[in-house]
Amino acid sequence: MSVAYALGRICVPIVFIWSAIQKLLNIGGFAKTLTDIQVPIPDEVAAYLGSMPKYVALAYLLAGLELICGLMIVVGLKARWGALVLIVFTAATVFYVHRFWDMEGADYVLHQTHALKNLSILGALLLIVAVGSGPHSLERRPPE
């Protein structure tokens, strides 16, 4: 079980790490996507950003969190915390990006499929929250 769990723990965050790298390589495009879907940013937060556009700052923050939390899970260092952050990130992605309930036709099918895929990823992340880093990790703790 320990090797299987370690392999699973390593496989789950690959999608987040790859996605984060792609976002960082095209931060302007990711910021435009966030602007287009109007992810809410409180004015109190925007006031601290100085001259940086708020959606560019949000793009860097989200891509950075996705990358760091994904790597935390891969190496098994505070994997529970990394998985918790990615659970919130994934749920927000379904709510703000894959709003299939507001769509029709091919868009409905495509975004519903993405939302269901993300639900499966949420399940895997919940298992990591339940078990933790496990063996074969930097924390080297056996599952509870």
Label every model-predicted segment.
Residues 1-36, 44-68, 74-144:
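Extended, low-polarity transmembrane helix blocks
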